[in-house]
Amino acid sequence: MHLYNEWLPPPVAEETKKEKESFARVVRCVKELHRPDDPESVYATLKWISVIELFVRAKSELSVEDVSELVEIGLQIFHSSENKLYAQVRWGNVLVRLINKFRKKLSLKVQWRPLYDTLIHAHFSRSPGPEGWRLRQRHFMAVTSLIRSCRRFFPQGAASEIWSEFMSLLENPWHNSSFEGSGFVRLFLPTNPENQDFFSEKWIKNVLELWDSIPNCQFWNSQWTSVLARVIKNCSFIDWESYLPMLFSRFLNMFEVPVANGSGSYPFSVDVPRNTRFLFSNRTTTPSKSIAQSIVYFLKPGSSAHEQLEKLVNLLEQYYHPSNGGRWTYSLERFLLHLVIAFQKRLQREQQDPDSLPATCLGKPERVAFVGVVLKLIDRGQYSKNEHLSETVAAATSMLSYVEPSLVLPFVASRFHLALETTTATHQLKTAMMSVAFAGRSILQSSMSTAKSQDLGGDVDDRMFLDLIGISLSNALLGMDANDPPKTLATMQLIGSIFSNMAVLDDSSDDLSFMTMASFSEWLDEFLCRLIALLQHLEPNSVINEGLSSSATSGTFLVEDGPYYYCMLEILLGRLSGSLYNQALKKISKFVQTNILPGAIAEVGLLCCACVHSTPEEAVAQIVEPMLLAVISSLKEIPVNGYGGKGSAETLVSNKQDKQTLSPALEAAIDYQLKVLSVAITYGGSSLLPYKGLLIEAISSAFNSSSWKVNGAGDHLLRSLLGSLILYYPIDQYKCLSRHPAAPALEEWISTKASSKDEQVAHSRWHVPTQEETQFANELLDLHLQSALDDLLSICQSNIHSDAGDEKTHLKVTLLRIDSTLQGVLSCLPDFRPSPRHDMVEDLQFFIAGASGSCVGSAEIREKTAITIHAACKYLLEKKSDDSILLILIIRIMDALGNYGSLEYDEWSNHRQAWKLESAAIVEPPANFITEFNSKGKRRPRWALIDKAYMHNTWRSSQSSYHLFRTDGNFSPPEPLTFLVDDLLTLCLHNYETVRVLAGKSLIKLLKRWPQLLSKCVLSLTENLRKPDVQEYVVLGSCAILSSHSVLKHLTTDPKSFSSFLLGILSSSHHESMKSQKAIIELFVKYNIHFAGLSRNILRSLESHVEGSTSGDLVSQIGSMSFDSSSLHWRYNLMANRVLLLLVMSSRIDPSFSLKILDETAGHFLKNLKSQLPQTRILAISALNILLKESPHKMQGKDQPSVSSQETENANSSLDLALSQIFREEGFFKETFESLSHIHITDTDSSSRGNHGSSSFQSMADKSITRFYFEFSASWPRTPSWISLLGSDIFYPSFARIFKRLAQECGVPVLLALKSPLEEFCNAKERPKQCVAAEALAGVLHSDVNGLFNEWDSWIMVQLQNVILGQSVESIPEWAACIRYAVTGKGKQGTKIPVMRQQILDCIVAPLPPTATTTVVAKRYAFLSAALIELSPPKMPVTEVKLHIVLLDELICNMSHSSAQIREAIGVILSVLCSNIRLRMSYQQEYPTEEGKTDVDSQLKEENWFKLISAKASEAVKNIQQASISDSLDTSTDVDMGNAQSNGDSLDDVKWMETLFHFIISSFKSGRASYLLDVIAGFLYPVMSLQETSHKDLSILAKAAFELLKWRVFPESHLQKVIGVILSSADDSNWRIRSSTLTYLRTFMYRHTFILTHEDKQKIWKTVEKLLVDSQVEVREHAAAVLAGLMKGGDEDFAADFRDRSYAEANSIQKRRNRRKSSSTQSIAGVHGAVLGLVASVLSVPYDMPSWLPEHVTLLARFAGEPTPIKSTVTKAVAEFRRTHADTWNIQKDSFTEDQLEILADTSSSSSYFA
């Protein structure tokens, strides 16, 4: 049994034993309801889902057989309800919960294919259903999480099936299907034991290759990282050693951090289509979790993973420092957190699985090493300004301190002392407090544990840690400050968490020796003084608001900002020993009696409450009794109304003569005392019985008072008293019952997953009401509920008040008393008894146990109250309908009456958010290496678990009877309840908004619980929308209720409500006011978003008009509304069209639906294309896209069997006829084109494509009506758009698709009808018109219908040629998009070739006439690039390959074209051509085909283009450089002819180079560079050397290419080539080139640090060192900066060697200087180089103080007297050193000697830092 259920109050715990039985009954019911032959039976099973969830959430003990049976049925139901997304969502979610909870006990086999089919059918197919996008989103989430849960049950061989299924999607990395493929692989690939044999070396190589094919794309990275992380974790047999350098290199480069002043994010990340990002987990940040998990599972004894991790941490640690925050902080913070969590989980797994191999387990040395590395990150991030990071650091410290206390605790201690010493940064103290609080338990355990399993090194350390706690507690006293909330809360958390560890707080015990400075009682005194001072100085948050809403506890930050205050008090007072408790109680009692603090009601109340909770008898005597007496004596002196229930009507009248008022001060005082009392007695229980008379008197006199404020306080007191008497709540919660076996001074903490040997966990004690208490409660009910009800009736029936004001007051007080008692007894007053149908008396079902207290009163009382309230409500609505306070009171009473259990539910949900119970301060991890004491789960203090059990009980009591009537149709709602519903229906249409909202909430809750009442409500509310003269507020109220989920769900199954709802909305256009229109539209949009299809019985009722029923004419009614001609407002016309579409789409699923309606609606929407209303046109486009299907006129491919002719004619003739009649009308298409061109808005700024671009004139609501989710899943283009020279187009693929479908539907007639309008519009002047023509042409060309060839030859080809040769420029983007659409490959992977592709390509490639202008040339190139992107390289037919070869030759000849625009186009096309060829070649090598060995392939293999370009490049660079040198020399005027000649050449070279740079840039931008790396590596030198030339454009391009190069990681195969280029250009004669080589080196080394070999690194170090003594100053300084970076980056041996050498060198120079004062013979460069070597060493450790640093800095400072370049270098470096070490200077200066400090002080201008 789960611990929480074991610890429930005894009466409830007894009941829970029946739950196993009742679950079995539920499973049987579901089984009976589900009939596999009838798919509609799914709807009947849905009502049981919430009941099944109940059992899961109640943590009941269920039998595994039942669960597995239910899961099997559930999966069947899930697969059989194919088109019912809503049912799949509900079943999917409940299955996920069941499978995850029982995953270790179930033995299922789940097939993956049906799940995949569901996913494809609902989200990746071209013809989706009508469901709203919110529902689709939920469906996607449900299906994917179901797949994740079922992965572990996939049978053997599933992995290889899945892999081969999705491999085909990954063939072409430049097609969007590859993103989908990676998403599917991540989602489906199982790593369960059955499938582990699939993961081989070959598979890993394959994955790494695939991963490399798309660079710089976080989506892609996160998919593959996640797959690998799972494999690494679960398949421990794979040896990863050889892949580590490569993987770590990947990991490092996935963190987008700024390297060497670069930017912190990818310059061009590859664009992932929106829907893929939306569907597959779309975190575009670094996949930190998977990286961390992989690294932790790499660690093994003897593996090199640890060194790699250390290197990674060395490179990343600087970005954790507070001064280096940025966008990357989030992913780094996650990385740290997941490293620690994964490490902890792995340790726990190894602890609990004793037979795991020692070879793979983490031993002591591995643990120490790991903790040591992570501490570096913790050290950097501890005082981060980023909230999350500093909290994560504290939590990580806490977890690691249980693993390796000897490393972590000294660190915590030193950090705490450091924070105490700094006076400037106060936020540090808060963080330091937090880390001590979080590590408190491990500090105490390691110092007090008697089993000293590992020695911390003598007593000194033990004392040190205990002192640390002592110091932190004494500092905590200073931390309580009313002006600094964060610090105050941190100190309270600290005190609470440390005392949670102690068994008892007492002076006499020796164990608490950490209170060195004073005895504990002194500390306690001081603490209470501070606390009282704090309470006296609190400022209340707001003016205490009058009226009902001011609860007793609207507190200040102590109560509002977290539970620490109350928690700390409870723990402290619960753990004190008897004598100390009395000492504290005296002090508190004195404080409470002498102070009145209306600003701190809640705080003082909680203080008293904690005292009472700890030992009720004494506290009640010392605190409650004096306060009660004081209040009663004050209450006697104030004026009364006497409506409070005591005394008869005569005395009332006599009291009334003098109306004196109450002084505000006295009123506030009484209010304060009553409210504090009400909080204080919350846990009083039976110890309140002696004061029964006093309490009754206090409450009655409070209600009798004439002040409303005092009445309200009386209400609090009554509520609290009732609760304290009859509810179940834990007592002794904070006492310590079991001590820790290893350290008796500490409390033992408990895990909820108790193993068998800890069974004797002490139960919690509950307050179970005694007979006297229930008797007292019943008396209170008589006094304040029964008598108040009689009063209420008498006021409403016999007018007893002549004065309206008196009547109002009396009503207010009477209602308040009723409300107060109902709120107090919660669900202890029995619920209404439902009336069974058919006179059968049957017992109520039982689902789960739960009660919040023992029963008082009877169901009759509830019924009587309801009937009285019904009468009162009627009276109020007649007489006092404008009095909102009375109405609100009455609604609250109705809520408490009707929604049985909802008050408990509210309390539970508020509490759930309030407690930060997961805080690391009170969690002890399962694997604890301090006490060598491991448990199955996390351990927590007993009080925290009791708190959870208490909340669990509250939740159970709210749910125990909630679902009884939802599943059982045998009961009809009791009569009083129907009264309440009628009243609430009237109230929720009230003209005051507050009243409407409250009544609405209450009504919706009631309807949820009694679904039988729904249809009545829906009918009456939709009637309100239809009536002509209804007030605005009635419309608003109706819409609010109608848009609730229960109503929307009800509409899918109930035909009558459905038709009344739709007609109600559509015929509500007569409401004038803006507000009501807005409400109606919002309701309609919400209906659309959540639309869940229609059930069969609604569709039947729609069709049944044949038999002459009424609702059948719904379709025709709506149809008549949706024509332009009807005089409706355009938005209603739009809504009618939308409803028509939804009906037709829903009905397509039903096979018996008549096709006639389908044809009619398709025709209707086709006509709407030329409608006058723009919105309706847009909707028509969506509709046609959905209704038109592919059809008989499409050409038959080779593989499809041809259909016999007469079949085709019958198959679709009806739709064909219906449509062709319409478009054969004269001028139909011309009009349509006209009206469509108006939708195209050429707004330059919006580059949003595909979303109808109609952003400018569509509001959000209209968008949701006109658009379908569908637009977003089958989106075009299917390849990434990265070519910027195409510009942004306004080409809408959905328009093109209509024309394509029309052509496929009706064949050649469409082509003929389109001919003349197309010819007219292609030559139009306006861009929108050309755009429509482009869309129509694209659709026709892509349609593949029979007879297209003839039309192509007769007129289409001519049209296309005209477009190419046309002079107009502005519509190029649209025509490029048209061509791109027309050649797009078909099928999911875009590999099926459209029939017309070859013809279109030939038409574009055909050479232009020699007279063509540059615009035409540029246009042709733009079209070419658009078309080439769409080709699918792996499977190109030979004709397309030949085309590539021809084009390559043409372009290489044109590379130095005179126009810049054309040069760019050539560069872009070259990158596409070359990468396409490369990809095809690599594909042919892997999967060679027989006919593939043609002459074409051998031509490709030679790669002539590569040789040509490379040769030309090196030559061009030389020429450009010489030219620029001769330019600078050539100042003479007489230029001879030869020179001019060479100048012209060099200009050609410049143009040629520009094209080459365009080629490089576009390869990077498009992500195609992976296939061209060897080519690009060859062009590294030109890019580096042409950064600074006299040709401005060239240099700009070179710089752009350079920025992109910095981000590229080269694989090992090309590294040698790159290093060769780097080394040679570092020796270049031009110093600018040397400098840019250094710039490149910094990032190059960072990106490749894991994969460079030792020799390569040595060469690079040597080269950089040589540049330290370069002749040019800039280069020298640059080299020093690079060296500092290299030294940070991990290669310790190189760094140490260099440091020693540079120190020796500088030292010898300094000594020589000292020997002879004269200037030395050494060159300035030499000395400067030596100094810079020192500078590099000093700057390489910006925040630490290693042992060698002081000497280096001092030596550096001695050079301050040198001549100019050296002097400034020294001063800058010392200043920088001082800046970065300023934070911790107080401690770090101890590592310097006095002399060294003096020398430093001389160099520094301001010596104040170095005091």
From Swiss-Prot:
- Record keywords: Amino-acid biosynthesis included? no
Q: Where are the HEAT repeats?
A: 563-599, 1156-1193, 1442-1479, 1613-1650, 1655-1692, 1746-1783
GO molecular function term, any single one: lysine-acetylated histone binding
Q: What is one cellular component GO term in this UniProt entry?
A: proteasome complex
Q: Could you tell me which InterPro entries the record lists for this protein?
A: ARM-like, ARM-type_fold, Blm10_mid, PSME4, PSME4_C
Gene3D superfamilies for the chain: Leucine-rich Repeat Variant (1.25.10.10)
Gene Ontology BP annotations: DNA repair
* One Pfam assignment: HEAT_PSME4_mid
Q: What happens when the gene is disrupted?
A: No visible phenotype.
Induction notes from the record: Upon MG132 treatment.
Keywords of the record: DNA damage, DNA repair, Proteasome, Repeat
Residue span of region Bromodomain-like (BRDL): 1626-1711
How does the entry describe the domains? The bromodomain-like (BRDL) region specifically recognizes and binds acetylated histones.
Would you identify the family this protein belongs to, as annotated?
Answer: Belongs to the BLM10 family.
Tell me the function of this protein. Answer: Associated component of the proteasome that specifically recognizes acetylated histones and promotes ATP- and ubiquitin-independent degradation of core histones during DNA damage response. Recognizes and binds acetylated histones via its bromodomain-like (BRDL) region and activates the proteasome by opening the gated channel for substrate entry. Binds to the core proteasome via its C-terminus, which occupies the same binding sites as the proteasomal ATPases, opening the closed structure of the proteasome via an active gating mechanism.
**Subunit composition?**
Interacts with the 26S proteasomes.
Its recorded name reads: Proteasome activator subunit 4
